[in-house]
Curated annotation (Swiss-Prot):
Keywords: Cell cycle, Cell division, Centromere, Chromosome, Chromosome partition, Coiled coil, Cytoplasm, Cytoskeleton, Kinetochore, Mitosis. It is found in: Chromosome, Centromere, Kinetochore; Cytoplasm, Cytoskeleton, Spindle. It comes from the Eukaryota. Disruption phenotype: RNAi-mediated knockdown largely results in sterility. RNAi-mediated knockdown also results in a high incidence of embryonic lethality in the embryos produced and defects in mitosis which include the formation of chromatin bridges in between sister chromatids during anaphase. In addition, there is reduced localization of the spindly-like protein spdl-1 to kinetochores, but not to microtubules. The gene is czw-1. Component of the RZZ complex composed of rod-1, czw-1 and zwl-1. This is Centromere/kinetochore protein zw10 homolog. GO terms for cellular component: cytoplasm; kinetochore; nucleus; RZZ complex; spindle. Its main location: nucleus. Belongs to the ZW10 family. The keyword Disulfide bond does not apply. The keyword Cell division applies. Pfam families: ZW10_C, ZW10_C2, Zw10_middle, Zw10_N. Essential component of the mitotic checkpoint, which prevents cells from prematurely exiting mitosis. Required for the assembly of the dynein-dynactin and mdf-1-mdf-2 complexes onto kinetochores. Its function related to the spindle assembly machinery and kinetochore-microtubule attachments likely depends on its association in the mitotic RZZ complex. The RZZ complex recruits the spindly-like protein spdl-1 to kinetochores. To prevent irregular chromosome segregation, the complex also inhibits the attachment of the kinetochore-associated NDC80 complex to microtubules.
Amino acid sequence: MASSEGSYRDLEKKLKNGLTSISQDIVDKYGNLKVSLNVNATAKLIFDRLENLEDIAEMSTRNLSNLIDQTAKDSPEMLAEIKSQAQSCENLVEFLQSMKNVEEQLIIMRSKTTNRVEWGTAILACKDFLNDTNMLLEGIGRDGFDMSVPLKHFAAEYSVLSYNCRYQLSADYERAMNVPKLSKQKCGDRTNVSFSVFNVGSVEDQKMLNETLSAMNMIGQLPERLDAWKIVILNVFCEAIVASRDGVDVYIVDNPTPDQTRFLINQKPRGKKDKTIDVAKVLESMEVFFTKLHSVLHSHELLDATGKTFTSMIGSVIEEQLITMILKDVIAIAAPVTETADEDQEMFINLLQIGEVFVERMKELGFFSQKAKLLFTLDTDTIFVTRRCFAIVSKANKLINETYDKLVTVGVDDSAIKDIDLLAKAHTHAEHFAKEYGKDLGRLWSHNEDSQFPSFFAFQKCTVSESTINFVNLLRDNVKAAFACEDEGARAKLALTAENIVRLYVILTPRKHAELFSSIPNMAAIFYNNCHYISHCIMTMSFEASGDNQKTLLEPLLLDSVIRLRTVAADCMEKTLTRCRREMTAYLEDHSIFEHLPASYKTTKNTFAAAEEMSESADILVPREEPKIIKCLAACLLHIRLIAKNLREPLTEVVYCKVIGSLVSFLLDSLVRHVVTTSDFRENDANVMADVFKRLLEVVANIVAYKEQTKVTDFCAREYFRLNEIVFVLGNRMQDIEHRWFNAKGPMAEHLSRSEVVGLIKALFADSQHRSDLIARL
């Protein structure tokens, strides 16, 4: 047993002494940096000692194996400890092997080898071995072997040598090609950017450059250089070629020295942005550029497992973006885009063919992969539908931005049949013609033919802008195209485009013409008509198209767009009316105009009359000073008349009467609120106001009129009759007021509340028993 334990202790001592010696050598070499040390000789010494210690550790492992067998027979209680020491030896062997691998790679990185691929391999391998050694360090540390200090020196040495190797590789690369590193952000003037490629003299130099490129690719340096190539080629040279519109005199390729080829942007002024783009010349200029670039780079290739050429590496980073640039910035701009997508199809295909020729040439030069296609996986039908939708939206945007200088009258005229049974008759009529037309009921409503039902779904006569007529025609053609489309995806795109252009109209028009609508009420009325005309046409479009998918396509348009259009129309008109009310409020907010009126003042026919309605009577020939209340009310009526004059022609009968009725209602309601909130009236003021208000009611009855028929009781009945009852109260006795009230059953009770009547009586008549009795009886 003593012999076994002595053998174990002897092995343990040898391992610790060996590790201590190696650790000191590593510290002297990498940590203390002793000048007297011969680096290469010391490195060889450390490597030899690591090998010797590895042999000792392996021998120890074998001896411990024999010791385990002997201990199992002689002393079973020591078996667990011996097995633990055997495992420690195995861990140490693995750690020493990893350290030896690290030192071996450091020797390669430190050597002056001309094979740059060995550098790249050593950098990657050394990093992996260092990671493995770090993972094993904790295990041997638990067994009493501390190697953390020498391992830190290994890591520091790797960092220095790796930096030196990377720097040397970068220097070799820069001697072969000088490409500036530019920001990806497109800022500043890049017309002075250039890059150079230097010719490689001998076969040996070419081999060394290829090894350099391979090593840089292995350690991750090449992708950064490829990004620099990508920015210079695409963002500088290709963009300049596209911006020139014809590719003429965009760049210069020269040889400042016999072994240098330089590419630089021509400083001469190029074409303007609005110049027509020539696809053939632009792509020809690009082809010449890449051909010359290929001529100076064709011999550069990688010597790793990929075997790629340097041109293919550049092509891999520019291929997708360059193809997108050709499609988007060259072909798409040159090809005409129309709403029908039929006119541009032939020319677009021709331009695509020119682009495909360029792609094939790039494949020959090695910049594009063999799988590269100009259109990727897209088919031409999808492209044409997308372009058509883009054209529809562009045309709609142009129509929305047009001013309302050209106006058109739409809707049925005044001679249209008006019959309460029109709907039932039209339904019977439709059933009759359904037998003749079959499923083509759209002919009954076609805008291109005389309608069979001029009053069914009739749109009242009004004025809209010509741009709106064109907008509706564009929308109608779009919807019909969606119905006629057989492809489900294309049909959905066209239907969505129809919905989108209506939303664009709703959102953009109030913003684009906001100043116009706020300053000219007539234009606000035109916009109101435009919105309702579009809504009407959207509803009738369902009769102009037929098919099983009719409901699916039209339902979103009907449910969403019609509501949006009517809402924005109402908002615009309400803003106009709000401004009008605000201006009238400025005249009526001074309550002093209702007080201290001239004694026995009487209005005449010319009071509140329009200028064209005034007669040459005595009060015109001899002008008199009118009280302030007359001037303020006349100003309000003048404002309403001006609005009415501007809106009578464009608006429909109903809308016109509602708009003017709203303004008149506001005026009358303002007067009513003033009277019912006044606590005391002078007798003369009450009599004059009764006369003034009576004359005012006569005038507004003529203002809220259409076709010489007053509509005041239809559109502002509440305010009109309330003021009429107040006129009665102001100009009559208490007994007459009681009779008109008639126990809350008379005409006065229909329009005025008891509290309002009581308040008027208290303000008009002095406090007396008779007044108290009357109030009690109300």
